[in-house]
Each structure stands twice: as C-alpha cells, then as structure tokens.
Amino acid sequence: MPYQDLIVGHKSMKNPDVIEFAGDYSLRDMLLINHEGEAIDIKYLVQEINVYESIYNNSITGTVVITDATNLINNLPIQGTERLAFKLKTPGTDKQQHIIDCSEKTGFPVNIFKLTHRQQLDEGVQMYILHFCSREFLRNMRTRVSKSYSGTLDTMVNAILGDKDGLDSRKTITTQKTRNSDKIVIPNKRPFDAVDMLCKRAMADNSKSVGYHFYETTKGYQFRSWESMCVDDKGIKR
C-alpha cells in the first residue's frame, strides 16, 4: 500500500452499474447532517469524492468537491460539527470489499472539519471542497490517556480504542496477537500516540519480528506486525 492510497475518485455519470473510467463509483446518497440532526441530501451537488487511507495514518481522511447552485452553505452553515453519511460502491459489483459504507444505518458517518477552495463559478453557482475525517480522528485530538495497563499489548490496544471516556471507537478492530506481556503506564498521551508507542514494543506471537503498524482502512482499524504485511493471503512471503 502506498503512502497515501486514493480509494475512489469520479462519480459514474451514465450507468451506475458500468465502469467507464478508473476511479468510477456509484453513489447511493450523501446526507449532510448538522449539529441539530437536520439532514440534507447533497448527492446531486457532488462532483468528486476522494477517500484516503495509508498504513502510516491512524485515520482515513477525504474530500468532497461540491458544485452548489442552492446556496447550501448559507442555508446550512458549515461550523465544523457536521457529519457526512454516504454509501458508495464500485459499479457492477456488490462485494463487500468494493463498498465504502459511511451510512448512518449500517456504517459510520464521517465528520467535516474544513471547507476550502470556495470560488464563484457563475451567478448563483459556487464550488468548494469539504474535507472530512473519521470520528475517532477528532476524539483523538480532544482526549488523553493517563493510565496503566497490564497484559498482552494487543489487549491494551483494544482497551485504548474502546475506552468510553477516550477514543470510544465502535468500529471493527483487527489485532494480531502479541507474544509479549507487560505492565505499561501511558503518560498523558493522545490515544493514537499511545497505540503508536505500543507498536514499537509489540512482538508478534507467531514470529521473532518486532514492530507493528496501526492504521485505519474503510473497513476498520488494523494493529498488525510488519512481517504479516509482507505475506500473501496464504501466509507465503512475497
């Protein structure tokens, strides 16, 4: 996986079940939800969606390019507390690995944290870019971990991510078991920094290697050894 992997790009315009160009996607709907819970479907304002994930980033991020002839951002001002709920897939397939689910019913909506590149295209028409991130990214900026943990490092990671008073992640967390147990004091660190600290100490249960990666994909969080990322699905080294 490259440093920053672009997951999707341009919306499939003609036939939502046929791929015409690389990066095409089929978008079911896209709801912009404000802090009061009011939702507006902005699907037809969307020109482009970009979702980024990386083994070097603890959270997914993304952008939505909007062409707005409805005066949306004045009628529903962007204050940094809004959420985006959407579900998109690769045209022509319903396989789970080709679906990005950020819907309210079955997935996890993302949070808008910035609006940039606002420009007037025509009278009554403007374009701008909405920047979004996962909910945990914002909670990580607002919370700290000051606590001692004991046991295997993979259980510590699960405890840090699921702490109701901290990161409070509800997403799938896939952890590779570690063979080393320890008692560790986290000295007032942000949750992601605490997990990154554990990554440097973690030793895989089924190998002699040291060092883990912690990152988020569109399917959830991963805490796994470097060595496990260098094998194929059958466990054979590449």
Question: Model-predicted segments: where are they?
Answer:
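Short, intrinsically disordered, mixed-charge
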Residues: 78-80, 158, 162, 200, ...
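Glycine-rich, acidic and aromatic/proline-enriched surface loops and short helix-turn segments
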Residues: 125-139, 150-173
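Second-shell loop/turn segments in exported
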Residues: 141-150, 180-186
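Short beta-strand-centered interaction patches in the first periplasmic/extracellular domains
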Residues: 127-130, 134-136, 174-238
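Short secondary-structure capping/junction motifs at helix and strand boundaries
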Residues: 94-97, 167-172, 206-211
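Assembly/oligomerization scaffold segments
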Residues: 1-142
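A generic alpha-helix structural signal
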Residues: 46, 157, 195-198
